[in-house]
Amino acid sequence: MENLFCPICGSRRVSPAANGIYMCASCDNAFSFTKEVTYAKTTADIYKASVECVLEINTIAGENESSGTGIVISPHGYVLTNAHITGEAMAGVGNMKNYCDVIIAGRRPREILFMAELIYSDKAADLALLYCAEAEEMPALKISYSTVKTGDKICVIGNGKGEGLGIVDGIVSDTCREIGGRKLMMISAPVTTGYSGGPVLSADGEFIGMVTGGRDGETAMNYAIPSVTIRKFLASAEKKAGIRL
């Protein structure tokens, strides 16, 4: 039992239920290590199970302040977000170079502000990896290996307009849309400024992508980086930055 962990949130607070089914005391999800378990989840269920893995991110570049979202993807304090969120703020000079503010769990008005350091970035993929010591031992979202289909229901958690974490839902409008040389997933969820860097979650609560942007005035035409691209980025980060996720 000491080697078991929840495949959804990463917690080790796992206990057997019945017939090969296990329960996680941290996220209240049921799962099996030997067979697929299917059950309906509400948007509220998905939010409850995943929100502790999502952070608010605030960056300042000169007089410009911007907000976004980050995802805890490792219990070692590593946070995934968009490169366009960290770009200008983390290209500064002096003691603040390569740092930005993060709000743990975003429980406004009880937010806790910490600093995060830029570890690795890929501007072409619009992905950045941060390190925040205070995020160590936090539950982490595990990247899904499931096949995503056009029409699948999804939810997105994000820091909309910089006003705190919230959740919106929609569907996968297209699993592969080429935009600016990148292969992205198109989603109908009405994400706004600040949702960039937020996780796209399947109807089962699996982490299948991350918001990267949308079209001005087209709230039902937004784009997400698919999980396969995220996995490649993280593998590159481990190799080139010499870290272990």
Outline where the language-model segments fall:
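Catalytic-histidine neighborhood of serine endopeptidases
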Residues: S67, S74-A124, A135
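Catalytic nucleophile loop of clan PA
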Residues: I71-V72, P190-V211, Y223
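Short metal-binding segments enriched for Cys and/or His
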Residues: N29-T38
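Short functional micro-motifs and their immediate structural scaffolds
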Residues: V14-S15, S32
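Flexible, gly/ser-rich surface segments that form the specificity/activation loops bordering the active-site cleft
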Residues: T42, E88-A91, Y120, P139-K183, ...
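A conserved glycine-rich beta-strand in the N-terminal activation segment of trypsin-fold
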Residues: K41-T43, V54-Y78, N82-A83, I112-M115, ...
